[in-house]
Amino acid sequence: MPELASVLVRDERSVLPGGFWAAVAVWLEKPQVLNKRLCGSTVGKKWDHVGEESESEGIDVETALAALLEDMSGPGRDEEMLKLISGYGKREEDSGSLTLRTLIPKSNPHFPSCQPRCEIVIRDLPNSVVTFLPLDEANQFKTNNIYQIRLAHVQDDEWSISLYTLCSEAWESDGVVYPKITWMKNELLSKLAKWSTEDKKSEFKSTLSLVPVDKYSRLYQNLKEKYRDMVKVWPEVTDPEKFVYEDVAIATYLLIIWEEERSQNQLKVKQSFVDLGCGNGLLVHILSNEGHPGRGIDVRRRKIWDMYGPQTILEESAILPNDDYLFPDTDWLIGNHSDELTPWLPVIASRSSYSCRYFVLPCCFFNFYGKYNRKSSKKTQYREYLDFVKEVGQQCGFNVEEDCLRIPSTKRVCLIGMSRTYPLTQEKRIDEQRTRYIKSQHTDSLHISTKSSLDKDDPPPLNCHAKNGQVDNVDSSLVQSEKLPGSWMPGFQPREKEEPIRNCALLPRDFIDETVLQVAKLLLYSNTKEKETPITDQSETVWNTGRSLTLREVAEHLHADTLQKLKNECGGLQTLLRNNHQVFKVINSNVSIRDWQKDTPTNTKKRKPEAKRTVPSDVLKTRLCWFYVHHPNGCPRVAKSCPYAHGAEELRPSFISRRKNPRNKLCT
C-alpha cells in the first residue's frame, strides 16, 4: 500500500503511542470535529475476534471480510493488506479490534443524494496501524477508498504519522462522506498529528452523547426547514439566526429524549412540559407545535409572543420558589438559560411530583440566594457552576445526567434529571434532606460574601460581576427579610419586569465626563500632581499618545465611590471606556489613548461593512472633539477630517431624536 503523505511529530511529553490512539478515537467517534459536512457518526459493535456473533447493522462482518479477501487475491494484490485481513481472526487477545461505524452526513442541498455510509475499522495495536474499509450501498467494499493511518517511531522523541491508500488514483470522492485525497493529506493527517501529542483532557462529555446522532440530524434538518421563516419576521433586537437555530436545536434534543423515554417506558401519550423563564417563547412554540402539551412562563412579555397564535401558551408572571409554584400534573420542567431560577429547577421538579423530570441549560451563575460565589480556583468558573447545579439535582434525589448540546453558544452543557435515586416511600425523608441542603447553601453564601467584604487586601472590582474571583455580595437587607408562608427561602429576588439598562449609557453625564478625563490624565501624564509631566517627549512635533495601563491599574487610581457606581453597571469600568471609543482603545484588558493618526479605516485589519464605516452626515460636527478640548497637543486630525467640532463655531444642531436623558454636546 503506497504512502501518500507523512508528518513528523515530537513526543516531548512521552504520550505516544497512547496519544495516537486517542487521536484516532476522535476521528472514529467524532469525525464532525474535522469534517464539517458530517453530522457525526455512530460506532456499532466492537469485536476482539471475528467469530460467531459477527453480524451487526444487517452486515455479516465475517462474510464481508471473506469476500474482500477473495476480491483482493487476484493479480496486483496487496500482500500487506491481505495479511492484515486474513490474520485478523488469529490475533492474540488485546492486540486489536474491529469496529463497525456509520458516517452520518448533514442535510445539504448541494449534496442531496449523500446518504449515511458504513465502514469497518480495524485497529492493529502492536503495529500502531488503523485501517478503514468503506462499504457501499449494497454493503460491498469500496476497495478504491480503503486507507490506513500508521504511527512509526523514527528516533529518540521523533515519530511519524503517515497516510496510505490502496488506490489513490481511483479514489472516489463525494465531498462529504468521502473527502478528497488532498483534504485527507492536508487536514486529517495534520490534525491527527497535533492531537496525538496533546496531553489535554476535556472537562465535558462528548456532544450529543445521550441521543442517537443520526436521528438527531434528520429531525434537526426537518425542524430547521420548518421554522426557518422565523428568522425573517423576528421582531426582537437579539440576533435572529442565533436564537432561532439555537432553540430549534434544543427542541430537537428534547423531542428525541422524550421519544426515547416513551419507547423505553412504553408510553403512548406525549410528555407535557412547563418552560420556566421562557424568554422569547420560541422553544415553547416549537414543542407545542410538535404535539407536546405545555406552556411557558416569564416575568416579562416579549413582542414576539403575539406572533405565535393561541396554540402557544405563554404567561407573564414572576416565578417564586414556594408552595404556590409547583406543577404536579407536568411531566417535564425546562430551564433554558433561566438565570436565577437555574438552581431551583431541580427543587421545584422534585417537589412537584415524584414523576416530574427536568432539563436545565445553565448560563449565568446564580445560587439559591443571588450571584454564585466561587469556592475553588482549580476548576473553571463554568465547570464549578455546572458541578454545583448537578449537586443540587443529586441532593434533590435525581440521577443527574450531563450532555453537550450542538448549539451556537459557549454555554452548551445541559443537565437532565430523568429518574430518582429513591423509592416513593422515602419522599418525606428526602424532602427534609433538600431543606437542609438549601439552608446550608444559604449559610455558605453569607459566609463567603461576608469574608469577601471584610478582606481589605482585595483590589477594587473592575466590573459588576467579578471581584478577585468572587461575585457580587449578597444584599444584607435580603438576609433580614421575613420568610413568607410557604416560602422555601427568604429574600429570593426574581428578575425585574422591566429589563434595566446597565451599559453605562444612563449614568449622569457629569460623572462620565469626570471619569473619562481622570483616566485620560492618568494615561497622558506620569503623575497627577500639580506639575504634571507628559509621558512622551514634549517636542511639539510629537503627539502625546501616553502610556498603556491594565484595567486593574486604572481602577486602583479611581475613587471608591466611582468604582461602586461602575460596579452596578454590566461590564463596569471596561464598558465605560469602550463606550468612549473616540478617546480610548481597550484591547485584552489594556487601556491606552486612541491615536487617530494610526487608527484610520485603511489601517484596520478587518474592514467593516460600508454602512458602519461611514459616519452619517447628520451627526457630523454635532459634538465637540474631546482631543481639541482636553488633549495637551490638541486633536491629531485637522478640523476638516475630524467628524467632531473643533470649537463652538463649528458646532451644528443635531437632528437625531433626543434621548429621555439628554446629554450635552461634548464628545466622549
UniProtKB/Swiss-Prot annotation:
Coiled coil: none annotated. GO terms for molecular function: tRNA (uridine) methyltransferase activity; tRNA(Ser) (uridine(44)-2'-O-)-methyltransferase activity; zinc ion binding. It catalyses: uridine(44) in tRNA(Ser) + S-adenosyl-L-methionine = 2'-O-methyluridine(44) in tRNA(Ser) + S-adenosyl-L-homocysteine + H(+). Pfam families: AdoMet_MTase. It is found in: Cytoplasm. A zinc finger (C3H1-type) spans 620-649. Residues 441-460 are annotated as: Disordered. It comes from the Eukaryota. Keywords: Cytoplasm, Metal-binding, Methyltransferase, S-adenosyl-L-methionine, Transferase, tRNA processing, Zinc, Zinc-finger. One of its GO terms (cellular component) is cytoplasm. Its EC number is 2.1.1.211. GO terms for biological process: tRNA methylation. InterPro entries: tRNA_uracil_MeTrfase, Znf_CCCH. Belongs to the TRM44 family. Probable adenosyl-L-methionine (AdoMet)-dependent tRNA (uracil-O(2)-)-methyltransferase. PANTHER family: TRNA (URACIL-O(2)-)-METHYLTRANSFERASE-RELATED. This is Probable tRNA (uracil-O(2)-)-methyltransferase. It comes from Xenopus laevis (African clawed frog). The lineage of its organism: Eukaryota, Metazoa, Chordata, Craniata, Vertebrata. The gene is trmt44.
